[in-house]
Amino acid sequence: MITRLSTLFLRTLREDPADAEVPSHKLLVRAGYIRRVAPGIYSWLPLGLRAVRNIEAVVREEMDAIGGQELLFPALLPREPYETTQRWTEYGDSLFRLKDRKGADYLLGPTHEEMFAATVKDLYNSYKDFPVTLYQIQTKYRDEERPRAGVLRGREFVMKDSYSFDISDAGLDESYAKHRAAYQRIFDRLGLEYAICQATSGAMGGSASEEFLAVSENGEDTFVRSTSGNYAANVEAVVTQPGVERDIEGLPEAVTYETPVSETIDALVDWANSIDVQIEGREVTAADTLKCIVVKVREPGAEEAELTGILLPGDREVDMKRLEASLEPAEVELAVESDFADNPFLVKGYVGPVGLAKNGVKVLADPRVVTGTSWITGADEKERHVVGLVAGRDFTPDGFIEAAEIKEGDPAPAGEGTLTLARGIEIGHIFQLGRKYTEAFDVQILDENGKRAIPTMGSYGLGVTRLLAVLAEQRHDDAGLNWSVEVAPYQVHVVAANKDAAAIEAAERFAAELSAAGLDVLFDDRPKVSPGVKFKDAELLGMPFALILGRGYAEGKVELRVRGGEKSELDADQAVAQIVEMVAQARN
């Protein structure tokens, strides 16, 4: 097909939008792909919608190739199914809730596990119906507290979500592996740089969980990779190597000291070394001190939050994402001044595990805080610290928690060297849900022995509209976007750069021949626009190939520009065949 720029609904911008922070947001707005309606809500203009449809086509091809069957559920959903799985409350404020005129509760779907499970229950009842994989490409809604970065983190977005239903765990393993491979093919076809990372399951529940993260310095997610081996994980899923337990017998008793100059960990360490305090016969370091972070944890459905103490080695900061992931589906926030005022036993800057335990506050510790480890920590009195407080003797945590930051150079699991940190954007997430949702909806079938059985589920999400923004993040330069042939709204951008009648007529002919060869063509036929503006727009819009008809056409030559690559001069009579071949090669 041919689309003429003279009639295309498009207005390009030379300046970045004021609210744009990341390249994808700036360029998609400037190039006329999207337009802001409200915070986190965007319109898809013709070029943007064509690119999204191209991504959807790749996703459909690969989902169909593994036996997926497409359907479509409504975005407006009743409350009841989400009450069944408790996610009406677990989702908290991120759920868009509304009432109809009769007062009945509804929501705008953030995800559709409940609907898939309930529908399979209604229609299938025999092992002969399984396995089955169903998917949809649907608009989702989440009330993000801080929507940002354009369509990278919005309140309305398009996702592909698919769900596998199997009789056995072995069947689930197979379905999971098929989806994993399909996602790799999708992202490879789109030309993405990505990592497959171990992840937490969060509110989804289930067991095995992996994220596909597009590598980007503007990513909100931090992930780690091992320097040797294949280990990769979202930072929220990294498991800390536990400390070594020691024999308590014979360890010195804890001693409380006045510490008037100890408001920071560094100051506390300097004080300890100034009076020759030693830990295991050596000088004190920050790792020998114990921070006690006070947080408030509110379980789903609970009216009030409960105080909880989080114990971390002093050389580590709390990582709120890791803390939140460890406590999901509960909500967690740091204690504030009013919490200290309401609880006088909380002496800010001097809180310790002993005082918390005496006052009935739950204490969760970093895995390095094991029996026999000795610490310098708060004595629950102003300007006083205790030295030699021993875990398992002087205090015992109620449990362990992954809440400490991960650092570059930390040991990788299974002896695979050390960890390196990188940033990424989540583009896909796959889960082995198991029977969480099928049990919740009492999905029962008869197995081959005539006995009752409950199917097991897999859940597989992929952000379609986010993918377009991620590709813009990874594939751009100072001049504009740089799409692959799989994603580009048009494979070829024909530019009539010469106002000579013969050149304009030839540009029409080239556009027609390229279209007849099966390519989508964007034809810049604007008569009153200068060649310089046309070239700038061509780079900004980002089609993979631009065919320029300029002064050289009189000598039988045309110019081919590969976006982000080289410029070359072609014989006019061979140009169409060469471009068709180059597009085919780019697809492969």
UniProtKB/Swiss-Prot annotation:
Keywords: Aminoacyl-tRNA synthetase, ATP-binding, Cytoplasm, Ligase, Nucleotide-binding, Protein biosynthesis
Leader peptide range in chain numbering: none
Entry GO terms, CC: cytosol
KW Coiled coil (keyword) present: no
Catalytic activity: tRNA(Pro) + L-proline + ATP = L-prolyl-tRNA(Pro) + AMP + diphosphate
Purpose: Catalyzes the attachment of proline to tRNA(Pro) in a two-step reaction: proline is first activated by ATP to form Pro-AMP and then transferred to the acceptor end of tRNA(Pro). As ProRS can inadvertently accommodate and process non-cognate amino acids such as alanine and cysteine, to avoid such errors it has two additional distinct editing activities against alanine. One activity is designated as 'pretransfer' editing and involves the tRNA(Pro)-independent hydrolysis of activated Ala-AMP.
NCBIfam families: PRK09194.1 (NF006625), proS_fam_II (TIGR00409)
Family the entry assigns: Belongs to the class-II aminoacyl-tRNA synthetase family. ProS type 1 subfamily.
Protein's name in the database: Proline--tRNA ligase
Organism encoding this protein: Corynebacterium glutamicum (strain ATCC 13032 / DSM 20300 / JCM 1318 / BCRC 11384 / CCUG 27702 / LMG 3730 / NBRC 12168 / NCIMB 10025 / NRRL B-2784 / 534)
